[in-house]
Curated annotation (Swiss-Prot):
<dbReference type="GO" id="GO:0000974">
    <property type="term" value="C:Prp19 complex"/>
</dbReference>
<keyword id="KW-1064">Adaptive immunity</keyword>
<dbReference type="GO" id="GO:0016445">
    <property type="term" value="P:somatic diversification of immunoglobulins"/>
</dbReference>
<dbReference type="GO" id="GO:0005813">
    <property type="term" value="C:centrosome"/>
</dbReference>
<feature type="modified residue" description="N6-acetyllysine">
    <location>
        <position position="91"/>
    </location>
</feature>
<keyword id="KW-0677">Repeat</keyword>
<comment type="function">
    <text>Component of the PRP19-CDC5L complex that forms an integral part of the spliceosome and is required for activating pre-mRNA splicing. Participates in AID/AICDA-mediated somatic hypermutation (SHM) and class-switch recombination (CSR), 2 processes resulting in the production of high-affinity, mutated isotype-switched antibodies.</text>
</comment>
<dbReference type="GO" id="GO:0005654">
    <property type="term" value="C:nucleoplasm"/>
</dbReference>
<dbReference type="Pfam" id="PF08216">
    <property type="entry name" value="CTNNBL"/>
</dbReference>
<feature type="repeat" description="HEAT 2">
    <location>
        <begin position="134"/>
        <end position="176"/>
    </location>
</feature>
<feature type="repeat" description="ARM 2">
    <location>
        <begin position="229"/>
        <end position="273"/>
    </location>
</feature>
<feature type="compositionally biased region" description="Acidic residues">
    <location>
        <begin position="66"/>
        <end position="78"/>
    </location>
</feature>
<feature type="compositionally biased region" description="Basic and acidic residues">
    <location>
        <begin position="34"/>
        <end position="45"/>
    </location>
</feature>
<feature type="modified residue" description="Phosphoserine">
    <location>
        <position position="389"/>
    </location>
</feature>
<keyword id="KW-0597">Phosphoprotein</keyword>
<feature type="repeat" description="HEAT 1">
    <location>
        <begin position="79"/>
        <end position="129"/>
    </location>
</feature>
<dbReference type="InterPro" id="IPR011989">
    <property type="entry name" value="ARM-like"/>
</dbReference>
Length: 563
């Protein structure tokens, strides 16, 4: 407490209710202090009837104690002081454990030791400013002891440990000393930190503010460790974190910062991780995601934070659909019907629903979803979006190009996977209304062909400069150039040309004649389309088996024979 506070001090009269701003300040002050300090404030409130002399006496004691703490903080942080701190921590932890065992039914006997333990945990936050000294936490078994305290009977202690671990694993701090960070993360992983954190999460009551903060800090530890060491995501998920996240997401609680954070951590765990995607499917996670997203089929998110959560859940769903077994679960869970509804409702969720459908139908694994999509009259939904991109795309970050990319990818998947009567229904769409959909396809073709020609000209100029400098264009550089071309519009152009090849091979003369007629009118040729499709075939199937790649290449190139 500083001099200003002392001078402005007024003893608590006990009758007047604190103003809202005073109440808020009191709450903030409570949050920033440990249990011992919080106890002090509670005493001040409870003893409102004490006279001014006693209040002043207590104030002087507080000032003296704060002064002593400041003197202690001024001690320079080095190996010796950290070792001393760890030794004090171990002693207090052991003493508290001993007293709890000796007097299990008499809290008065061990409460003082618990407050002392909490105090030293708070002091250890200073170690987070020196990641080079993290090795001492491991060598002196402090990490092991801290992990043990995550199961402490008093959640105030476990929350204090979580708060400390969150600060120690702060990603910026970890990058300050790679060596110190590696040692700490190794010790945490070896100690099964994820399993212990989940066990602690299970008992926290989020209606209590401090415990809700504990949940938030726990999720921050996971995020920090996942960013520093992505491979730990699999262990964390298997040690119960994935199950807890799903349970927390579907809990009937008002939307808050913790629910948003859960959605974010879930998306992180599923990123490029087939094991976690499979585990989520086994835990009925696809149904949980669909249930949570169903809220947004007719209602827009009410805040920017709720919209961010919605996008995280959509990202998680798209990630899961990379796995064929989850496509089946998505189909059985009526995911197609939900996404189709979202497209029709024209809410903020529409753009993301389109992306989900793209992931659900792509490749041979999407065949069943493609057939079901036609059964639920999805063609009536997708073609209006193909004919005209929404003028106002409300979702932040969604562009007209992304919209057209997903729509064309969906149509390409439908043409690849549909058979029989459903394929006929799809092809008939290209002949109705004087082949207006063929006209739209050709319009998009020239739009993205033009964009590609601009990008290719720029890349050729860069290649020329590289050669002129006497440098060699290696495979890595060629890959980089190809990725840039895909991003500039080649990706969508390949899908457009593939759609052209498919519909021209459908034995519907009207379609083929219209395609050739428009190409001639615009001074273009089949050769350009053939070249784009050949390049598409050469680069298809990355990450798949050689057999699939070879079969798919033959199938695509066969389309060119009758084009």
């Amino acid at each position: 407490m500083d001099v200003g506070e002392l001078l402005s001090y007024q003893p608590n009269r006990g009758t007047k209710r604190p103003r809202d701003d005073e109440e808020e300040e009191l709450k903030t002050r409570r949050k920033q202090t440990g249990p011992r300090e919080r106890g002090r404030y509670r005493e001040e409130e409870a003893t409102a009837a004490e006279d001014t002399a006693d209040d002043k006496k207590r104030l002087l004691q507080i000032i003296d104690r704060d002064g002593e703490e400041e003197e202690e903080e001024e001690e320079p942080l080095d190996e010796s002081s950290v070792k001393k701190m760890i030794l004090t921590f171990e002693k207090r932890s052991y003493k508290n454990q001993e007293l709890r065992i000796k007097f299990p039914d008499n809290p008065e006997k061990f409460m003082e030791s618990e407050l002392d333990l909490n105090d030293i945990i708070q002091e250890m936050h200073v170690v987070a400013t020196m990641p080079d000294l993290y090795h001492l936490l491991v060598e002196l078994s402090a990490v092991q002891s801290l992990l043990g305290l995550l199961g402490h009977d008093n959640t105030d202690v476990s929350i204090a440990v979580v708060d400390l671990l969150q600060e120690l694993t702060d990603i910026d701090t970890l990058h300050e000393s790679e060596e110190g960070a590696e040692v700490l993360i190794d010790a945490l992983v070896d100690g099964q930190v994820a399993a212990l954190l989940v066990q602690n999460l299970e008992r926290l009551d989020e209606s209590v503010r401090e415990e809700a903060d504990g949940v938030h800090n726990t999720l921050a530890i996971v995020e920090n460790m996942a960013e520093f060491r992505p491979e730990m995501c699999t262990e964390a998920a298997q040690q119960g974190l994935l199950q807890w996240l799903l349970k927390r997401l579907k809990a009937k609680m008002p939307f808050d910062a913790n629910k948003l954070y859960c959605s974010e951590v879930l998306a992180i765990l599923l990123q490029d991780n087939d094991e976690n995607r499979e585990l989520l499917g086994e835990l009925d996670g696809i149904d949980v995601l669909l249930q949570q997203l169903s809220v947004f089929k007719r209602h827009n998110p009410s805040t920017a934070e709720e919209q961010e959560m919605m996008e995280n859940l959509f990202d998680a769903l798209c990630s899961c659909l990379m796995l064929s077994s989850n496509r089946e679960r998505f189909l059985k869970g009526e995911g197609l019907q939900l996404m189709n509804l979202m497209l029709r409702e024209k809410k903020v969720s529409r753009s993301s629903a389109l992306k989900v459908l793209d992931h659900a139908m792509i490749g041979p694994e999407g065949t069943d979803n493609c057939h079901k999509f036609v059964d639920i009259l999805g063609l009536r939904t997708i073609f209006p979006l193909f004919m005209k991109s929404p003028r106002k795309i409300k979702k932040v970050g969604t562009t007209e190009k992304e919209h057209e990319e997903h729509v064309c990818s969906i149509l390409a998947s439908l043409l690849r996977n549909l058979r029989g009567q459903q394929r006929t229904r799809l092809l008939n769409k290209f002949t109705e209304n004087d082949s207006e959909k063929v006209d739209r396809l050709m319009e998009l073709h020239f739009k993205y062909l033009s964009a590609m020609q601009v990008a290719d000209k720029k890349i050729e100029g860069e290649k020329h400069d590289i050669v002129r400098r006497g440098e060699i264009i290696d495979n890595d550089m060629e890959d980089e150039f190809y990725l840039r071309r895909l991003d500039a519009g080649l990706f969508i152009l390949q899908h457009i040309c593939y759609i052209m090849a498919e519909i021209c091979n459908a034995n519907v003369p009207q379609i083929r004649q219209r395609v050739h007629q428009i190409l001639n009118m615009r001074g273009s040729s089949i050769k350009i389309v053939r070249h784009i499709i050949k390049e598409y075939a050469e680069n298809i199937g990355d990450g798949r088996s050689p057999e699939f790649r070879e079969t798919e290449q033959k199938r695509i190139l066969a389309l060119l024979e009758n084009f």
